[in-house]
Amino acid sequence: MVSLSSHPARALRGEIAVPGDKSISHRSIMLGSIARGVTTVSGFLRGEDNIATLDAFRAMGVQVHDDGETLRIEGKGLHGLTEAEDVIDCGNSGTSIRLLTGLMAAQRFYTVLTGDRYLRRRPMRRVVEPLSRMGACIHGRDNGEKAPLAIVGRPLTGIAYDSPVASAQVKSALMLAGLYADGATRVTEPHLSRDHSERMFRHFGARLETDAAGVTVYGGHELDGRDIVVPGDISSAAFFLVAALIVPGSELLIRGVGVNPTRTGILDILAAMGGSVELLDQREVSGEPVADLLVRSSALKGIEIGGDVVPRAIDEFPVICVAAALAEGTTVIRDARELRVKETDRIAAMAANLRAAGATITETADGMIIEGTGRLNGVTVESFGDHRIAMSMLVAGLAASGAITVSDTECIATSFPTFTALLDKVAVR
């Protein structure tokens, strides 16, 4: 296991561009593969999760050419995928396995999906159950709750599904299945999750309708290849936003970040805490809003976080916890039970790590209470095999009284292979 240490910084200064958005990168491969004609993708995130998706489609007969800058996908059309000769390994990627489950349920062949030991613990019935209502034949451990999943493709029928959780993965799995289903497939949620799938479906020419409650996909219509430019991932930018806010004297410009409104909960939360983050040169790229983010160090204060903002910031909560621990006053996080079924239980993991660094934290069933003191101590902590836990604690080390060492950091390559190099570039020590 590789351990990394983060030492106190005097400031963060300069300009960076974070890698391409992980969610959009996944979807570009999936839709490009089942579209007719050629799709090009620039800005693709070459993290382990996205490579797992890429390898899955190559295993199903899709030709993907990579010159190091741009992917060229030779789409096979809705019914052109072929059966993989082996089990498809999704690694640590929940997005890969859940979205592929929806897509594979409608194919004319047999598929087995698995993943690493962390992914095999994560809940899958949330996609298996509604897909089964559509007519899918899916078998898995623990009555379909856990991977590996064995999927026998068969004709599907559209349904109206009211999801009990606001999950873009659940919604997107059903949308992908809905492309093949007889009739309309409608998905509603308690709070609207990120809408990258809806935007990209439109970009590829799918027939769908959206409203305030959800999305409806009409099956049986072919997609056409498109050119896609993937913006920088706001979930990756979040580590640098918080780092610059908590280290006095910092000023950092992050260029070309996706600012889709369903993903900008992190910006709203940091602004409510008193953080200075400006959106510059706002524009649209491949159907997605993009901006440059200028962040300056700020005195943060504790706030209450809950409700609709939670699904808009669900992946950023580990680093939000770091900001809260270094703020003045109490931060209450609620309505975030989904954090307990991520790559690890992120509520328990961040509570344990920040307590080890001297923070006062009380766990609740759906969140935590953080008593901000503006101070953390140097310590050695665990990543729990979770890339966002690892990076969040390395950010904490920039503003701690001593070095914070994180063990088992190979997981960072899941989403942000260049994280430490960018951190070294802008940290003034």
From Swiss-Prot:
Molecular function terms from GO: 3-phosphoshikimate 1-carboxyvinyltransferase activity
Biological or metabolic pathway of the protein: Metabolic intermediate biosynthesis; chorismate biosynthesis; chorismate from D-erythrose 4-phosphate and phosphoenolpyruvate: step 6/7
Entry keyword set: Amino-acid biosynthesis, Aromatic amino acid biosynthesis, Cytoplasm, Transferase
A GO BP annotation: amino acid biosynthetic process
Pfam families membership: EPSP_synthase
Binding, phosphoenolpyruvate: 22, 94, 122, 169, 346, 388
Function per UniProt: Catalyzes the transfer of the enolpyruvyl moiety of phosphoenolpyruvate (PEP) to the 5-hydroxyl of shikimate-3-phosphate (S3P) to produce enolpyruvyl shikimate-3-phosphate and inorganic phosphate.
SUPFAM superfamilies tied to this protein: EPT/RTPC-like
The protein, known as: 3-phosphoshikimate 1-carboxyvinyltransferase
Gene3D superfamilies in the record: Enolpyruvate transferase domain
Xref: PANTHER family: AROM/DEHYDROQUINATE SYNTHASE (PTHR21090), PENTAFUNCTIONAL AROM POLYPEPTIDE (PTHR21090:SF5)
Residues that hold 3-phosphoshikimate according to the record: 22-23, 27, 167, 169, 315, 342
GO cellular component terms, A-Z: cytoplasm
Catalytic activity, as annotated: 3-phosphoshikimate + phosphoenolpyruvate = 5-O-(1-carboxyvinyl)-3-phosphoshikimate + phosphate
Tagged with keyword Amino-acid biosynthesis: yes
InterPro entries according to UniProt: Enolpyruvate_Tfrase_dom, Enolpyruvate_Tfrase_sf, EPSP_synthase, EPSP_synthase_CS, RNA3'P_cycl/enolpyr_Trfase_a/b
Subunit structure and binding partners: Monomer.
Catalytic residue positions: 315 (proton acceptor)
Location (main, coarse): cytoplasm
Domain of life per record: Bacteria
Enzyme class: transferase
Membrane-spanning intervals of the chain: none
Family: Belongs to the EPSP synthase family.
Family matches, as NCBIfam families: aroA
EC number of the protein: 2.5.1.19
Annotated localization: Cytoplasm
